[in-house]
């Protein structure tokens, strides 16, 4: 079997849609896929760990990396910077591993400009009321922050049509199954299978069964 370049999956959602929980559930299944860890200039939340959730750096370090063109995409959100390592993405895809990239729609457009065949997946909440409830349940966010996130959510939701797939995250187990099905379907596409199994196909087409 021949190794093919990895597939880049972009997953986006408004804050509170449950994207992070969905991605964590996917990784816990043991799926053969690498999660891209973004760089950020914001402070870590109590439960977050450097190198696992984000690469936490100072604003000065982030701006230096930005000037040195180290990011495939970058964006400012709620006064903090976020960016994806260009070198890591290229090396991982070249090795044949699939990558899951958690970014917003602004970053997704930047990535698709470089990787137009990237597979876009957008996660929707079942309703705006559920989205607001999820945001209010976050103890670390102030009322002002929740209001900002709700306003940003409406803007983010307007870009759902730019993606290849849409998942409704009402029940986590159902959303997880949908996400796994998308990845499996992409891996079985003819273009990739022809490269992976060209030896088998060549053997089958030249060997007589009689």
UniProtKB/Swiss-Prot annotation:
Annotated EC: 2.7.4.8
Tell me which residues make up the Guanylate kinase-like domain: 6-184
| InterPro entries per record | GK/Ca_channel_bsu, Guanylate_kin-like_dom, Guanylate_kinase, Guanylate_kinase_CS, P-loop_NTPase
Q: Where in the cell is it found?
A: Cytoplasm
Keyword Transferase present in the record's keywords: the answer is: yes
Sorted alphabetically, the Gene Ontology cellular component annotations on this record are: cytosol
Q: Its principal location?
A: cytoplasm
Query: What keywords tag this UniProt record?
Result: ATP-binding, Cytoplasm, Kinase, Nucleotide-binding, Transferase
PROSITE patterns in the record, alphabetically?
Answer: GUANYLATE_KINASE_1, GUANYLATE_KINASE_2
Its UniProt entry gives the catalysed reaction(s) as: GMP + ATP = GDP + ADP
Q: Which domain of life is it from?
A: Bacteria
A single GO molecular function, which one? guanylate kinase activity
Q: What class of enzyme is it?
A: transferase
Positions annotated to bind ATP: 13-20
Q: Which family does it belong to?
A: Belongs to the guanylate kinase family.
Q: What does this protein do?
A: Essential for recycling GMP and indirectly, cGMP.
HAMAP family xref list: Guanylate_kinase (MF_00328)
> What is the protein named?
Guanylate kinase
**In which organism is this protein found?**
Nitrosospira multiformis (strain ATCC 25196 / NCIMB 11849 / C 71)
């Amino acid at each position: 079997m021949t190794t093919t370049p990895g597939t880049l999956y972009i997953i986006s959602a408004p804050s509170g849609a449950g994207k992070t929980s969905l991605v964590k559930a996917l990784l816990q299944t043991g799926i053969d896929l690498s999660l891209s860890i973004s760089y950020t200039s914001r402070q870590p939340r109590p439960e977050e760990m450097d190198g696992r959730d984000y690469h936490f750096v100072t604003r000065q370090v982030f701006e230096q990396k930005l000037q040195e063109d180290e990011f495939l995409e970058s964006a400012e959100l709620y006064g903090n910077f976020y960016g994806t390592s260009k070198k890591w993405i290229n090396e991982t895809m070249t090795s044949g591993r699939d990558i899951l990239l958690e970014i917003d729609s602004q970053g997704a457009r930047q990535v698709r400009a470089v990787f137009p065949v990237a597979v876009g997946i957008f996660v929707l909440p079942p309703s705006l009321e559920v989205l607001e409830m999820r945001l209010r349940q976050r103890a670390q966010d102030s009322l002002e922050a929740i209001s900002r996130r709700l306003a940003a959510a409406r803007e983010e939701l307007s870009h759902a049509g730019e993606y290849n797939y849409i998942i409704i995250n009402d029940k986590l187990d159902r959303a997880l199954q949908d996400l796994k099905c998308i990845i499996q379907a992409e891996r079985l596409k003819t273009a990739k299978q022809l490269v992976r199994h060209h030896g088998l196909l060549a053997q089958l087409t030249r060997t007589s069964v009689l």
